[in-house]
UniProtKB/Swiss-Prot annotation:
CDD domains: DhnA (cd00958). It catalyses: dihydroxyacetone phosphate + acetyl-CoA = 3-hydroxy-2,4-dioxopentyl phosphate + CoA. The lineage of its organism: Bacteria, Pseudomonadati, Pseudomonadota, Gammaproteobacteria, Enterobacterales. The active site is at 203 (schiff-base intermediate with substrate). GO terms for cellular component: cytoplasm. This is 3-hydroxy-5-phosphonooxypentane-2,4-dione thiolase. It is an enzyme of class 2 (transferase).
Length: 291
């Protein structure tokens, strides 16, 4: 125990200064518990309020798709350039070194494949395991308007309830069924429902018309999915448009790891998200970094 000799009375109480507790300013998250805010503060940069996530969880239903055949070779070099890693618990345990020291968003839904109906998912991760793996959030699909809409919403509710008990945020990922139209009306509905169910982060797709309305109508942070592989200049333009219209970051996979120069592309995306660079300037950075 501390030495009891020569204990001095405190004097520097600054009685003229009220106690300060800096508020947590992430959109819609000011009333959350300390532990959940702490995890969210690791996901979102404290200075910019934004994030660049690297998604490589595709194997949970696609298997070893292009670019993810050997995650230890193709994806591991990208870890240091990402703010957050998004993956499954299987890949985290088998491939990601603990010393990587990056916040992790764990895929928490699954039980389907590309050979069956994609929207037929179940919760595929216990909250105990998410805590055991020191993750900063869990993520699950929500399929509004699909055959299994009800089950996917129940999955989100289950994860939110379990997460609230341990201070673990839930990210709802707005999946799109085979016959659904990707437009502002649909994503406004899907993102709002997910937020109303309690999800603390929403991952959705960027749309050319009305994206700012999607963001405005969602009371928690939105990060955009990268979606299918685009030419680098187009992917950076999508990032810039989304950030300019209010997105809180990106969660990109194929547009990073399927690029001819993934590290250069990651740096260019970081420039858009955290440094407000235009798509043109970010593309110039990409070209210079790939040399």
């Amino acid at each position: 125990m501390a030495d009891l000799d020569d204990i001095k009375d405190g004097k520097d109480f600054r009685t003229d200064q009220p106690q300060q507790n800096i508020p947590f300013t992430l959109k819609g998250c000011g009333a959350l518990d300390w532990g959940m805010q702490s995890r969210l503060s690791r996901i979102f940069n404290s200075k910019t309020g934004k994030t660049v996530m690297l998604a490589f969880d595709h194997g949970y239903f696609q298997g070893p798709t292009t670019g993810l055949e050997r995650i230890d070779i193709s994806i591991a070099p990208l870890f240091e350039h990402a703010d957050v890693l998004m993956c499954t618990r299987g890949i985290l345990r088998s491939v990601v070194p603990p010393a990587t020291n990056k916040p992790v968003v764990l895929r928490a839904s699954g039980a389907n494949s590309i050979l069956a109906e994609l929207s037929n998912e179940a919760v595929a991760l216990s909250m105990d395991d998410a805590v055991r793996l020191n993750s900063c959030a869990v993520a699950a699909q929500v399929y509004i308007g699909s055959e299994y809409e009800h089950q996917s919403i129940k999955n989100i509710i289950q994860l939110v309830d379990a997460g609230m008990k341990v201070g673990m945020p839930t990210m709802a990922v707005t999946g799109v069924g085979k016959d659904m139209v990707r437009d502002q009306r649909y994503f406004s509905l899907a993102t709002r429902i997910a937020a109303e169910m309690g999800a603390q982060i929403i991952k959705t797709y960027y749309v050319d018309k009305g994206f700012e309305r999607i963001v405005a109508g969602c009371p928690v942070p939105i990060v955009i999915a990268g979606g299918k592989k685009l030419p680098e200049r187009e992917a950076l333009e999508m990032c810039w448009q989304a950030i300019d219209q209010g997105a809180s970051g990106v969660d990109m996979g194929r547009n990073i790891f399927q690029s001819d120069h993934p590290v250069a592309m990651m740096k260019a995306v970081q420039a858009v998200v955290h440094h407000n660079e235009t798509a043109d300037r970010a593309y110039e950075l990409y070209l210079s970094e790939k040399q």
